[in-house]
Design a protein with these regions (language model features):
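Short, Lys/Arg-rich, polar N-terminal cytosolic tail immediately upstream
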Residues: 1-11
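Hydrophobic transmembrane alpha-helices and their membrane-interface boundaries in multi-pass
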Residues: 16-92, 99-105, 123-125
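Alpha-helical transmembrane segments and their interfaces in multipass membrane proteins
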Residues: 30-54, 109, 113-172
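Short, charged/polar micro-motifs that form catalytic or ligand-binding hotspots
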Residues: 92-93, 115
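Residue-level hotspots within the lipid-embedded alpha helices of multi-pass solute transporters
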Residues: 93-94, 153
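Alpha-helix N-cap/helix-start motif
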Residues: 95-97, 118
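Long, heptad-repeat coiled-coil alpha-helices that serve as cytosolic signaling/dimerization stalks
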Residues: 177-183
Length: 183
């Protein structure tokens, strides 16, 4: 698997952009919970999950502040997102499965194929577990939607790997051209 080695400055910029992307996702999670409370009535667990999403924003901010120039910051944000994403998915309907895609696309800025593949596979597994739970509950409409998301996850894994590989190749070609011009 391919990965591009980023400089500290590149990690700093990429981690800051990823913080912005994840903050938007977490705020969207809060919106999902609030709309469910409005639609279905008060739910203590919805408020607990909203608290978790706000805590995730704050924790992601701390991660970026402390580890902005390091790969560890990227990994910490990715792990946190997967955990919070799982809480969202298992606490809500099948439609929330699509929230894996903005993060997967965002994490492509790190040009790290293993990061993308691992994140995609974990979201794929979360989708499968959600489908199993929907099937047991007899929710065929949501099960059908979740099945489409699973297929979309598979396509995302494949396509994002291809895109990251090509972007790394482009980067290496550009570096070779710059080095050749410098000589």
């Amino acid at each position: 698997m391919k990965r591009q080695v980023l400089t500290q400055q590149q990690y700093k910029r990429a981690n800051r952009v990823m913080f912005f992307i994840l903050t938007i996702c977490y705020l969207f999670f809060v919106g999902i919970e609030i709309s469910n409370v409005v639609k279905h009535g008060q739910s203590t667990m919805a408020y607990v999950r909203c608290g978790l999403y706000v805590a995730a924003i704050l924790l992601t901010g701390v991660i970026v502040k402390l580890l902005a120039e390091k790969k560890a910051g990227t990994i910490a944000m990715a792990v946190l997102y997967i955990v919070v994403y799982a809480v969202l998915v298992f606490g809500n309907g099948a439609g929330t499965l699509v929230m894996a895609f903005p993060a997967i696309i965002g994490f492509m800025i790190f040009l790290n194929e293993p990061l993308i593949v691992i994140g995609s596979v974990i979201s794929f597994l979360i989708s499968i577990v959600k489908c199993i739970l929907l099937n047991r509950a007899g929710d065929s409409l949501s099960l059908g939607f979740a099945s489409v998301v699973i297929l979309g996850s598979f396509v995302t894994i494949w396509c994002s790997r291809m895109a990251v590989r090509l972007l790394i190749d482009f980067s290496q070609e550009n570096q070779a051209e710059i080095q050749k011009a410098a000589e």
